């Protein structure tokens, strides 16, 4: 693989902060879906799957080794109908801010046009951002692997023209089809590419060739928050509150856009160059303008009672996950984690958990207000941001002092 990369891409003097190495993962609770590709926006019927055979566990992910080539996109489109193009926003130019971590929803990269645009057709970015660009692998210099997953790998990359540093996620079509998760990929692209927030990883666009799909992503040099939590065992109140505050602000933005994440967990959170938290995985997210859903998804330890019981759910599932995450930050493990799936389900349904003695009363108050069996009784996100424990512990340090986790 390395030889193929070297032959097709010139080496570059890219300063690399720290690799996003492979670590233990939780397996998401999957839903059986048809392997037939559907156009974006096509409704997918909700299904409830509940059983020990597909519940998540922390395991070592399998390494995949794609052989990258400079093959241009073909007309076999994995995510969209054949009449639509693969267009996306262009990373910033050399005279602009090249640090991906400083991108926010109020400051978007420049874009340029290559060829004609598809009038009246959707693309990977909002139309208001201006002109679009069609990408191919030859537009990038590929660096070292940043991470490995079930369906492909993530590489450090640099856009040749602008010298913009980014992450290139390479997914194999055959594996996506075999697992029946094409709908998740389409959903991730459609949702994440339209979100602009400093605590949400930017998805600039995508392209594909005969066998692979490529996602152009922000580069988060801090790596997975899960790895950082493993290294530290648990976080103190200040660091935990800072992350919960950032995540609450990002979720508040998502909910304002009618987006429910449904799979908040440390493995889906990355750390930017300044140590800021970034939501990175929207594979289980849904855009539900006015509907409630019954689909079982996400990670077992983070599932709320209404989802494991097969009841209707809405954006309040993210409030439950926020409470579970806050507990795991402070304790080092999820509150309902047990040796068996059945016992974990039972404890979630009963909201049965205990606090270690070192967890402060203010932190317990916040977690307890989020982990309510009745979704309507959970503390809303604005209440989270106004909670005394958050206000007391999430104050930013001096401007010249990096946040925890900054590389």
Swiss-Prot record:
Keywords: ATP-binding, Cell cycle, Cell division, Cytoplasm, Cytoskeleton, Kinase, Microtubule, Mitosis, Nucleotide-binding, Phosphoprotein, Serine/threonine-protein kinase, Transferase
Active site: 263 (proton acceptor)
EC number: 2.7.11.1
Chain residues that bind ATP: 150, 169, 217-220, 281
PTM statement from Swiss-Prot or TrEMBL: Phosphorylated. Autophosphorylated on a serine residue.
Cited InterPro entries: Aur-like (IPR030616), AURKA (IPR030611), Kinase-like_dom_sf (IPR011009), Prot_kinase_dom (IPR000719), Protein_kinase_ATP_BS (IPR017441), Ser/Thr_kinase_AS (IPR008271)
Enzyme class: transferase
One Gene Ontology CC term in the entry: kinetochore
Positions with biased composition (Basic and acidic residues): 1-10
Alphabetized SUPFAM superfamilies for the sequence: Protein kinase-like (PK-like)
Protein name, per record: Aurora kinase A-A
Function recorded in the entry: Mitotic serine/threonine kinases that contributes to the regulation of cell cycle progression. Associates with the centrosome and the spindle microtubules during mitosis and plays a critical role in various mitotic events including the establishment of mitotic spindle, centrosome duplication, centrosome separation as well as maturation, chromosomal alignment, spindle assembly checkpoint, and cytokinesis. Phosphorylates numerous target proteins. Important for microtubule formation and/or stabilization.
Principal location: cytoplasm
Keyword Transcription tagged: no
GO BP term, pick one: mitotic spindle organization
Gene: aurka-a
Tissue expression summary: Highly expressed in ovary and testis.
Disulfide bonds: none
Species whose genome carries this gene: Xenopus laevis (African clawed frog)
UniProt region (Disordered), positions on chain: 1-130
Similarity remark: Belongs to the protein kinase superfamily. Ser/Thr protein kinase family. Aurora subfamily.
Region (Activation segment): 287-300
UniProt subunit comment: Interacts with kif2c and kif11.
Pfam families per UniProt: Pkinase (PF00069)
């Amino acid at each position: 693989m390395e030889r193929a990369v070297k032959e097709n891409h010139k080496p570059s003097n890219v300063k690399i902060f720290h690799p996003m190495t492979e670590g233990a993962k939780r397996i998401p609770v999957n839903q059986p879906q048809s392997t037939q590709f559907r156009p974006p926006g096509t409704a997918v019927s909700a299904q409830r799957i509940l059983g020990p055979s597909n519940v998540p566990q922390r395991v070592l992910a399998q390494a995949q080794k794609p052989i990258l080539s400079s093959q241009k996109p073909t007309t076999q489109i994995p995510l969209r109908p054949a009449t639509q193009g693969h267009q996306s926003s262009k990373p910033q130019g050399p005279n602009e801010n090249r640090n991906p971590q400083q991108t926010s929803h109020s400051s978007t990269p420049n874009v340029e046009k290559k060829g004609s645009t598809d009038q009246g057709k959707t693309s990977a970015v909002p139309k208001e951002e201006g002109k679009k660009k069609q990408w191919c692998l030859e537009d990038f210099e590929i660096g070292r692997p940043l991470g490995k997953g079930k369906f492909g790998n993530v590489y450090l990359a640099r856009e040749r023209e602008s010298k913009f540093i980014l992450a290139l996620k390479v997914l194999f079509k055959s594996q996506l089809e075999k697992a029946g998760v094409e709908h998740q990929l389409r959903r991730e692209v459609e949702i994440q590419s339209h979100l602009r927030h400093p605590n949400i990883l930017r998805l600039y666009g995508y392209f594909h060739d005969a066998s692979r799909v490529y996602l152009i992503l922000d580069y988060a040099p801090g790596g997975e928050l899960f790895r950082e939590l493993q290294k530290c065992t648990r976080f103190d109140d200040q660091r935990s509150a800072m992350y919960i505050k950032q995540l609450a602000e990002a979720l508040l933005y998502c909910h304002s856009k009618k987006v429910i994440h449904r799979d908040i967990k440390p493995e889906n959170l990355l750390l930017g160059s300044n140590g800021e938290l970034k939501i990175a995985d929207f594979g289980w997210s849904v855009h539900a303008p006015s509907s409630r859903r019954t689909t079982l998804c996400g990670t077992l330890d983070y599932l709320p009672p209404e989802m494991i019981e097969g009841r209707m759910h809405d954006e309040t599932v993210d409030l439950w996950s926020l409470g579970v995450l806050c507990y795991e930050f402070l304790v080092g493990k999820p509150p309902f984690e047990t040796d068996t799936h059945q016992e974990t389900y039972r404890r979630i349904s009963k909201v049965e958990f205990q606090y270690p003695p070192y967890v402060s009363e203010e932190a317990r108050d916040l977690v307890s207000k989020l982990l309510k069996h009745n979704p309507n009784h959970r503390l809303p996100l604005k209440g989270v941001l106004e909670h005394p424990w958050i206000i007391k512990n999430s104050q930013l340090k001096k401007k010249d002092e990096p946040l925890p986790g900054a590389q």
